[in-house]
UniProtKB/Swiss-Prot annotation:
Transmembrane feature ranges: none
Keywords, ordered alphabetically: Nucleus
Top-level taxon: Eukaryota
Protein name, UniProt field: Nucleolar protein SWM2
Family annotation (InterPro entries): Swm2
Family statement drawn from the similarity comment of this UniProt entry: Belongs to the SWM2 family.
Major location (coarse): nucleus
Organism (species): Zygosaccharomyces rouxii (strain ATCC 2623 / CBS 732 / NBRC 1130 / NCYC 568 / NRRL Y-229)
Pfam families the UniProt entry points to: Swm2 (PF17083)
Subcellular location: Nucleus, Nucleolus
GO cellular component, one term: nucleolus
Keyword field contains Nucleus: yes
Length: 121
């Protein structure tokens, strides 16, 4: 598939249907290697992200495609407001059920070790 064609039609779900989204990763890698194509892709990503931030009705599948393309080229996610990140897990846990049963054994397996923070920075 022509890389310029991919960039130009990434928004068109009729031309590049949603079931092809997973196969576009290799195309993104090739785009990232070409300086001109990656600049064109970044410009297009920024336009789509601006439309998203202005609530201009960007399809979530299209947004995910451009977010993936951006992260392949730039090496990090674009900080989108309101983007539903799939790896974010929010859960509340009541720890009392774990602590109350273990109250007599709390310090049995405690290991205290001094570590220099500069070793990890």
């Amino acid at each position: 598939m022509d890389l310029k064609f991919v960039i130009d039609n990434l928004q068109d779900l009729g031309v590049l249907p949603p079931d092809q989204s997973l196969t576009l990763g290799s195309q993104y890698q090739l785009i990232a290697r070409d300086e001109q194509l990656s600049q064109k892709a970044i410009d297009k990503c920024e336009k789509v992200f601006l439309q998203w931030s202005l609530n201009r009705g960007v399809n979530i599948e299209v947004l995910k495609r451009f977010q993936n393309l951006w992260s392949v080229i730039k090496g990090k996610d674009f900080p989108l407001v309101g983007f539903p990140y799939s790896n974010l897990t929010i859960q509340q846990v009541d720890v009392n059920q774990y602590i109350s049963n273990q109250s007599e054994k709390l310090m049995k397996n405690l290991t205290v070790e001094e570590v220099e923070i500069t070793d990890y920075v």
